[in-house]
Amino acid sequence: MVDLIARDDSVDTCQASNGYNGHAGLRILAVFIILISSGLGVYFPILSSRYSFIRLPNWCFFIAKFFGSGVIVATAFVHLLQPAAEALGDECLGGTFAEYPWAFGICLMSLFLLFFTEIITHYFVAKTLGHDHGDHGEVTSIDVDAPSSGFVIRNMDSDPVSFNNEAAYSIHNDKTPYTTRNEEIVATPIKEKEPGSNVTNYDLEPGKTESLANELVPTSSHATNLASVPGKDHYSHENDHQDVSQLATRIEEEDKEQYLNQILAVFILEFGIIFHSVFVGLSLSVAGEEFETLFIVLTFHQMFEGLGLGTRVAETNWPESKKYMPWLMGLAFTLTSPIAVAVGIGVRHSWIPGSRRALIANGVFDSISSGILIYTGLVELMAHEFLYSNQFKGPDGLKKMLSAYLIMCCGAALMALLGKWA
């Protein structure tokens, strides 16, 4: 390792001082302004998704979600990978840093290591849940016996079967009712409630039915696109058919598997963003003449990053035992940059961003973070959301998808523009 970072000569030409030029009061103010902007960005989606008095229309959350996705993708390339390349490519480092583009190499290693981690995690999650892909009988009907009103799913070649539309399956030890994703399915009464029966029967209108087993989703507002039946999601084989006797168990297993994979993606996303936020704060605290411009830009930078992270945290269907996690994750992001600014002010005479150690540390961590956010952005936020999600299905699916795409482009463009100054 010493050989890797050693120079060919004994003269250190890296900076020996930082650009700190006073303005201590303004720098202290920056701690609180960055705190507010970070908190506003990350907590607004979380609060609006949980409290009705500030709950926004669905289209507002839709915009925030995909705008934030664009912000994260642009952050990976413009605010992480490029600065990492500049830091590790600085002429004062010399040695192996002058012979190989280490920023891109570390980014690539980080990306592949993250992919390997997700492969192993997904395997053990599926194994733990007893998830296999054997042959199963095709579902033609579902029968749920419950004391509330229901409707009949009628197979044209078989007798109608009663299904209770308030039957609760456990998704994460929470009782969450399931409904159909296809809003065009209409249930109409076919007969009056029979004496002694506690179920009202309904018949789905002809021409508007699909296999209900492939349409069950949780009605919780925080579980959009989280739960789906095997064969219809990003993590399971296409067109799997489930045996009726195993359907409820398989739904629970797939829900848990989807949940655990989504949780992993959210934690990875936060990890990459927090890494970056540390050096953002340190750089701001000792900036010289560019401090005022950098201060303004980083205020919006943190707000937009928080928005991207907050929407992903908010849409995760946390179990009752983990309801505090969104608040903790938001708090971690909110505090990271302000604390880094405060620490930087405290060590302003010893922290030199252009020094050899600082360049290497900053470049390595930015490279790692860029690999994390590039993988998360391209795989989870783009490919998974646009190609494998059920939210763009239906007659207006293409219109919604193109709208989401344009919104994401706007988020990426704005964040890329901020890269001109920070």
From Swiss-Prot:
Q: Where in the cell is it found?
A: Membrane
Q: Does the keyword Coiled coil apply?
A: no
Gene Ontology annotations for the cellular component aspect, listed alphabetically: endoplasmic reticulum; plasma membrane
Carrying Phosphoserine, the residues are S148, S149, S162, S170
A Pfam family the protein falls into: Zip
User: Extracellular side of the membrane: what ranges?
Assistant: 1-27, 82-99, 284-290, 348-358, 422
Q: Which residues carry this modification: Phosphothreonine?
A: T188
Q: Which residues lie on this side of the membrane: Cytoplasmic?
A: 49-60, 121-262, 312-326, 380-400
> Which superkingdom does the taxonomy of this entry point to?
Eukaryota
Among the GO biological process terms of this entry, one is: zinc ion import across plasma membrane
Q: Which cysteines are joined by disulfide bonds?
A: none
**Which coarse location class applies to the principal site listed for this UniProt protein?**
membrane
**Record keywords:** Ion transport, Membrane, Phosphoprotein, Transmembrane, Transmembrane helix, Transport, Zinc, Zinc transport
Q: Which residues cross the membrane?
A: 28-48, 61-81, 100-120, 263-283, 291-311, 327-347, 359-379, 401-421
Signal sequence segment: none
InterPro entries per the UniProt record, alphabetical: ZIP (IPR003689), Zn/Fe_permease_fun/pln (IPR004698)
Q: How does the protein associate with the membrane?
A: Multi-pass membrane protein
Asked if the keyword Ligase belongs to this entry, the reply reads: no
MF terms in GO: low-affinity zinc ion transmembrane transporter activity
Q: What does this protein do?
A: Low-affinity zinc transport protein. Active in zinc-replete cells and is time-, temperature- and concentration-dependent and prefers zinc over other metals as its substrate.
Misc. remarks from the entry: Inhibited by Cu(2+) and Fe(3+) ions.
Identify its protein family.
Belongs to the ZIP transporter (TC 2.A.5) family.
Protein name as catalogued: Zinc-regulated transporter 2
> Could you tell me which species this protein originates from?
Saccharomyces cerevisiae (strain ATCC 204508 / S288c) (Baker's yeast)
- What is the name of the gene encoding this protein? ZRT2
